[in-house]
Amino acid sequence: MRLVFGEKDAPYEEARVVVLPVPYDLSLSFLPGARRGPEAILLASRELEPFLLELGAAPEEVGIHAAEPVPWVAGMAEESHRLIREEALKHLRAGKWLVALGGDHSVTHPLVQAHREALGEFSLLHVDAHADLYPEWQGSVYSHASPFYRLLTEGFPLVQVGIRAMDRDSLRLARKRGVALFPAHRIHREGLPLDEILEALGKRVYISLDFDALDPSLMPSVGTPLPGGLSYRQVVDLLEAVFREKEVVGMDFVELSPNGQFHAEMTAAQLVYHAIGLKGLQAGWLSREVDHI
């Protein structure tokens, strides 16, 4: 049985938003299980309240369709990434706004490539505990530790928020390539520098969010948890500012590794649903029923 997001699954022809499960985790280097993340988020989404009090609207009313999971080939990273890119392109060319659910973070590379081919140029907002700027990891350029190195070399402007693990070479590369870096420790000491983040981004933005950006006390179900992460409120405030000021062309949410802690899956589903609502308000697909709550 095909899983859906939330209580209502819009017919594909009527949907504005397509949720694309990408259950690929061939490149994980620590705890396994991210391939089960998309299914866990879809199952948890059944329990969400359709009306979001904070938004004053019900995001499901934009029309959300959950697509079939993208197939992948065990042991064949390059071929699997090609399949991800082609599946994303299919939905983008049909005029859908895409929210992809990983899977490990390597899936971001083919997803971003598909968005560029279909929609043109944009900047990247990468929210994560890890910089993911290794040229390769464990002998593979398709590692979940490498997607943003590859995207940097392909010319994408990059803004990274919430980072708390980064090696010397990655830091040197980030400085050389003009990456705008907003590490978690600075955010905790000084507050979320929204004006600086918005200034560093272009007019059009693709957002990639690794759930380990959140503190493990809130989000324990990730492959590589690190203390000192962002709060749910900080992440929501960041997303709200970006959606308010920029055109968000697409998103992915990655690296949920379900481990029996349902509150983490609910948190992930709620964050995805909130982001869909923000896009609905930005694009004029939704209107606030109630203001100033």
UniProtKB/Swiss-Prot annotation:
Keyword terms of this UniProt record: Hydrolase, Manganese, Metal-binding, Polyamine biosynthesis, Spermidine biosynthesis
Feature type site, description Important for catalytic activity: H144
A GO biological process held by the record: spermidine biosynthetic process
Cofactor binding note from Swiss-Prot or TrEMBL: Binds 2 manganese ions per subunit.
Catalytic activity: N(1)-(3-aminopropyl)agmatine + H2O = urea + spermidine
Pfam families: Arginase (PF00491)
Any one GO MF annotation of this record: agmatinase activity
EC number: 3.5.3.24
Role this protein plays: Involved in the biosynthesis of polyamines which are thought to support the growth of thermophilic microorganisms under high-temperature conditions. It seems that long-chain and branched-chain of polyamines effectively stabilize DNA and RNA, respectively. Catalyzes the decarboxylation of N1-(3-aminopropyl)agmatine to yield spermidine and urea. Does not act on agmatine.
Protein name as it appears in the record: N(1)-aminopropylagmatine ureohydrolase
